[in-house]
């Protein structure tokens, strides 16, 4: 199902994807098959962060998940955040994925061991996507995201 050698998406393919985003409608989003595919992406041990980043860059993630779309390019004007909400969210996911790497095992053995014992990591990844869900609005995101 996946080609681990695939590195980039050709510009022509990206244009075709962009021209087809209108096909990702509520029927598409509510399809059990498509929901399973999305969860399988999160379960994927190979480059889930890169896949979601490509989905975001191509507009697919925002079309599939309209709430995420609201966070794209959304600045956070406070002392704690230097990235846009969408970039911050994908960075959180990337940091979670780092916890399962050999590099993390060498630097932070305890964190690595705790991470290895987590069952259903896809739920953790999904929660990282949800953590900034309310930041795309002008309201208190800690309340909107509940």
Specify the residue positions occupied by each region the protein language model found.
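Composition- and surface-driven signal marking solvent-exposed, interaction-prone regions
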Residues: 12-14, 54, 66-70, 105-111, ...
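Divalent metal-dependent catalytic cores for phosphoryl transfer on phosphate-bearing substrates
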Residues: 84, 111-146
């Amino acid at each position: 199902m996946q080609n681990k050698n695939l590195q980039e998406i050709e510009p022509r393919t990206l244009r075709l994807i962009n021209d087809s985003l209108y096909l990702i409608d509520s029927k598409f989003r509510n399809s059990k098959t498509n929901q399973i595919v999305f969860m399988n992406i999160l379960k994927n041990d190979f480059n889930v962060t890169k896949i979601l980043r490509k989905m975001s860059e191509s507009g697919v993630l925002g079309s599939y998940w309209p709430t995420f779309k609201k966070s794209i390019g959304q600045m956070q004007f406070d002392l704690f955040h230097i990235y846009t909400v969408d970039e911050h969210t994908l960075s959180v996911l990337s940091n979670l994925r780092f916890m399962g790497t050999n590099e993390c095992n060498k630097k932070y053995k305890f964190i690595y061991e705790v991470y290895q014992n987590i069952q259903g990591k896809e739920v953790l990844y999904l929660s990282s996507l949800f953590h900034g869900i309310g930041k795309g609005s002008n309201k208190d995101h800690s309340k909107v995201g509940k």
